[in-house]
Regions:
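Extracellular carbohydrate-recognition regions
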Residues: 1-52, 217-253, 260
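Intrinsic-disorder/low-complexity, polar/charged segments enriched in Ser/Thr/Lys/Arg/Asp/Glu/Gln
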Residues: 3-8, 96-100, 104, 160-162, ...
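Carbohydrate-binding surfaces in secreted/extracellular proteins
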Residues: 11, 101, 157-185
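Short carbohydrate-recognition loop motifs
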Residues: 40-82, 244-245
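Secretory/extracellular carbohydrate-interaction modules
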Residues: 65-141, 251-255, 260-262
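Beta-strand-rich interaction surfaces with strong enrichment in secreted/lumenal proteins
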Residues: 85-91, 149-155, 195
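Flexible glycan-contacting loops in extracellular carbohydrate-active proteins
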Residues: 184-209
């Protein structure tokens, strides 16, 4: 039976330039996700960059010989605290899938680059990354990183590497260029979740493919629909939002000064 395609991304639909981000470093954007103008495709940037120094976008779309790439451009990931820039795709219900992606790093002196999987959110996921001249499979929880397994790997800036992670229940098999490096069992894989490209150094991603079986795809849809029905049932027990008052600000913004008490 043919694999069911969850994601088939080569970034060709993206215009050359910046992936959407909060260019104004707004107060709202500091605490909330805002859908900024621009093309997102099937991707979401869950890691805001608020260093207020005009550093620009975390991610850009570049082109070489007619092929598009998604590039990570953020070279500081320690302010205001340790962060892991990433783009995610999919949802929390994805599970038992295979992710394959290409990555080329533009420095080997520091930082990491690779793929994420079983992402419940940007602070709870598994990653397969190159770092400190090793290939590592890690569990990230908030700022803490647990190395589940590692092996020496002499990577460079000239080659493009094909990373692959196959997840089935708690079983994870990780490969680079069709060579298996890790075959582990971990409870962190059972949760399933989104996929990601992630890097703390300038790095270039050429494609991301995610596949699963037809039966698993059907069970993913069933779980998603069941959760939606559960939420709608819970919401039905509470009163709906009702407009009580409108205030004309005469063209002025609210900044941080307008609170519910003012209404």
């Amino acid at each position: 039976m043919a694999d069911f395609i969850l994601l088939n991304e080569d970034f060709s639909d993206f215009p050359i330039g910046e992936f959407p981000y909060d260019k104004n470093h707004s107060a709202m954007g500091e605490y909330h996700f805002i859908h900024y103008p621009g093309y997102y495709g099937k991707w979401h940037d869950p890691v805001c960059n608020h260093t207020y120094n005009g550093q620009g976008a975390s991610w850009i779309i570049s082109e070489y010989n007619g092929k598009h790439f998604m590039e990570q451009m953020r070279i500081r990931n320690d302010k205001p605290h340790r962060t892991f820039p990433m783009l995610t795709s999919g949802d929390r219900f994805w599970r038992d899938y295979t992710i394959t992606a290409s990555v080329r790093m533009f420095t080997t002196k520091w930082g990491n680059a690779g793929i994420g999987f079983c992402c419940q959110n940007s602070a709870n996921l598994l990653v397969l990354v190159f770092e400190e001249h090793e290939l590592r499979v890690e569990y990230r929880h908030k700022e803490e990183v647990t190395i589940l397994d590692s092996v020496a790997f002499n990577y460079n800036c000239d080659d493009t590497y094909i990373l692959k992670a196959e997840i089935k229940g708690s079983h994870v098999i990780c490969s680079v260029d069709d060579k298996v490096y890790f075959d582990i069992d971990t409870e962190y894989a059972v949760q399933g979740g989104k996929v990601a490209v992630t890097a703390t150094i300038p790095a270039q991603f050429g494609f991301v493919n995610v596949t699963t079986s037809e039966s698993t795809a059907a069970s993913i849809d069933a779980a998603r629909n069941a959760y939606k029905a559960e939420c709608e049932n819970a919401q039905a027990h509470y009163p709906k939002m009702k407009l009580l008052k409108k205030i004309d600000l005469n063209g002025c913004g609210t900044g941080r000064q307008l609170r519910f008490g003012h209404l």
